[in-house]
A protein has these predicted regions:
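Non-heme di-metal
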Residues: 1-213
């Protein structure tokens, strides 16, 4: 059953939930990568990660069954998903950027602003996603992959759309759009978001912290 969402965060929560439609495509990105020149040492873990994405999609679907969906947000999320699928960057790179700089921002948002059901599911997913990002980071490093400027622009467009309903310079930082946009930028470029230190998603390796030699 639905619980109480944080006042002022409702529309953004529905947009963030709509991004669940990217869970399975991220799994497909990884599956596609397994058919290419992925290091054998990473294959077993990557295959496990794909199974996790299916579980995440199912768990988030339970949440939407309880609290409902915003049909406009759902439609826009499908359009964003299509843009991610069509983007030419390597599939494992798309998975890494989506998980680290989008999912790692949405999950703390859920934990600060969602009801008890959303908070529980997001905590469970966060544990898996940390393993996914660490694994994908190492694979991208081993393959010498770095995100293109256009993939970064797609990341920015996605995160901006999710948090667009929030205000700016609000007294509650968790209702401040810039707080979350900055978190995404820092996770993307620095691999850490100190402002998310209350969560387990505050520190992941940045692209430049892995040697591509």
């Amino acid at each position: 059953t639905a619980g109480q969402l944080k006042a002022g965060a409702e529309e953004t929560i529905y947009r963030a939930l709509a991004i669940r439609h990217m869970e399975l495509p991220v799994g497909e990105f990884i599956t596609d990568a397994l058919e290419k020149n992925v290091p054998d040492s990473a294959r077993t873990l990557l295959e496990s990660n794909v199974k996790d994405e299916v579980k995440h999609d199912l768990a988030l679907t339970y949440i939407t069954n309880a609290i409902g969906v915003d049909e406009k947000a759902e439609a826009e999320a499908f359009r964003l998903r299509d843009a991610w699928e069509a983007h030419p960057d390597h599939t494992i790179l798309k998975a890494l950027v989506a998980e680290r700089a989008i999912f790692f921002v949405i999950l703390p948002f859920f934990r600060f602003c969602g009801d008890s059901g959303i908070r529980t599911v997001s905590a469970d997913i966060s544990r898996d996603e940390q393993i996914h990002v660490a694994c994908n980071s190492l694979v991208c490093s081993a393959m010498g992959l770095r995100p293109s400027n256009s993939l970064d622009k797609l990341r920015k467009a996605t995160i901006n759309w999710i948090f667009q309903p929030l205000g700016i310079n609000t007294t509650d930082k968790y209702l401040d759009k810039n707080f979350w946009l900055d978190s995404s930028d820092r996770l993307m470029y620095e691999g850490k978001a100190p402002q998310l230190s209350d969560t387990r998603s505050a520190r992941m390796p940045a692209f430049f912290e892995h040697s591509n030699v």
